[in-house]
Amino acid sequence: MTTTAKTDDIPIDTVILDIEGTVCPITFVKDTLFPYFIEKLPSILDKFQYPLSNTSASSDDQVLNILKQLPDNITKSSESIYKHFKNLVDQDIKDPILKSLQGLIWKQGYENNELQAPIYQDSVEFIESFPTKSSTNNKIYIYSSGSIKAQILLFGHVKSTTTTTTTTTTITNEVIDLNPKLNGYFDITTAGFKNQSNSYKKILQEINKSSTPKSVLFLSDNINEVNAAIEAGMKSYIVIRPGNPPIDDDDDGNDDKINHKIIYSLDELDL
């Protein structure tokens, strides 16, 4: 039997959501987005002449302008550029040039429906319903290590779901845009690293909640992020989803997850 997660003391009117492992399968980025980027990269690189140092970047060619930021020894051939980016992806290195190029290629994939974000149905329903659940104008924000541009793309192209009853199965082919339901976005460039309490204090300041941090709930699958949010004064729960890795001890080596509220679906929230 599922136990509804109740909040205490000050009512919660603001929820901040992590993405991977919280509202979206943790495998989506590594099993879908990263391979899509690597698959499309050769055809993108084949559009240009090499070495790129001899090629003029036009103001409207975003890809070429990004590639021109690479050192000359990398841009001497399409093969060397491909090898460079693949190495960064394989090692999960958060390189700004890589992220810029990934963002452009993913944007094309989302726009032609080759990519759709598999947001959990309970998360879709929560995002659609929570803002209008009371007259106090409840708010939802996103905080992810992925860029804000990538966050907006993801929530703007949410995969439709299949609804099954005892007698019928309804399949919708529409792509859902959840961005109108969201009040803002934060990433590591605008708020800071997610395992540091100062990042959450900065968010509280940005959303005018510094004086009432207990009215803000942060949801994440990462215990260190949850601890950092709590240290900043927020309420925070651990979210466990299928496929998520086991919850490790925190950065101090403490197995303190037993002291945290844990939910397995946003349906369990009683806000």
From Swiss-Prot:
Q: Which reaction does it catalyse?
A: 5-methylsulfanyl-2,3-dioxopentyl phosphate + H2O = 1,2-dihydroxy-5-(methylsulfanyl)pent-1-en-3-one + phosphate
Enzyme Commission numbers on file: 3.1.3.77
Recorded metabolic or biological pathway in which this protein acts = Amino-acid biosynthesis; L-methionine biosynthesis via salvage pathway; L-methionine from S-methyl-5-thio-alpha-D-ribose 1-phosphate: step 3/6; Amino-acid biosynthesis; L-methionine biosynthesis via salvage pathway; L-methionine from S-methyl-5-thio-alpha-D-ribose 1-phosphate: step 4/6
Q: How is the cofactor bound?
A: Binds 1 Mg(2+) ion per subunit.
Task: State the superkingdom.
Answer: Eukaryota
Q: What does this protein do?
A: Bifunctional enzyme that catalyzes the enolization of 2,3-diketo-5-methylthiopentyl-1-phosphate (DK-MTP-1-P) into the intermediate 2-hydroxy-3-keto-5-methylthiopentenyl-1-phosphate (HK-MTPenyl-1-P), which is then dephosphorylated to form the acireductone 1,2-dihydroxy-3-keto-5-methylthiopentene (DHK-MTPene).
Name of the protein described by the UniProt record: Enolase-phosphatase E1
UniProt organism field: Candida albicans (strain WO-1)
Gene that produces this protein = UTR4
